[in-house]
């Protein structure tokens, strides 16, 4: 990322430490399957999820917070989505077996 982008990110937080923690947490969310907030054409064409997380933060579409409740809510939503996907796959397999 360009230095001006990093300066913008630093202005969104109260410290370099908080920026690094928030970026790392977002990268972990992306690795866990969280959808990107960036439009497809702006997504990073790299496996470096830290860079993608920083670009997402730079857009302003994500807010920097420390709320544990937000993290828990994200995790619960992710688990629900994953369970729904698995259930849909199981239902599709059952339908194929019936045919």
Swiss-Prot record:
One of its GO terms (molecular function) is DNA-directed RNA polymerase activity. InterPro entries: DNA-dir_RNA_pol_omega (IPR003716), Pol_omega/Rpo6/RPB6 (IPR006110), RPB6/omega-like_sf (IPR036161). Gene3D superfamilies: 3.90.940.10. It catalyses: RNA(n) + a ribonucleoside 5'-triphosphate = RNA(n+1) + diphosphate. Its EC number is 2.7.7.6. The keyword Transcription applies. Keywords: DNA-directed RNA polymerase, Nucleotidyltransferase, Transcription, Transferase. Belongs to the RNA polymerase subunit omega family. The RNAP catalytic core consists of 2 alpha, 1 beta, 1 beta' and 1 omega subunit. When a sigma factor is associated with the core the holoenzyme is formed, which can initiate transcription. This is DNA-directed RNA polymerase subunit omega. It comes from Deinococcus deserti (strain DSM 17065 / CIP 109153 / LMG 22923 / VCD115). The lineage of its organism: Bacteria, Thermotogati, Deinococcota, Deinococci, Deinococcales. The gene is rpoZ.
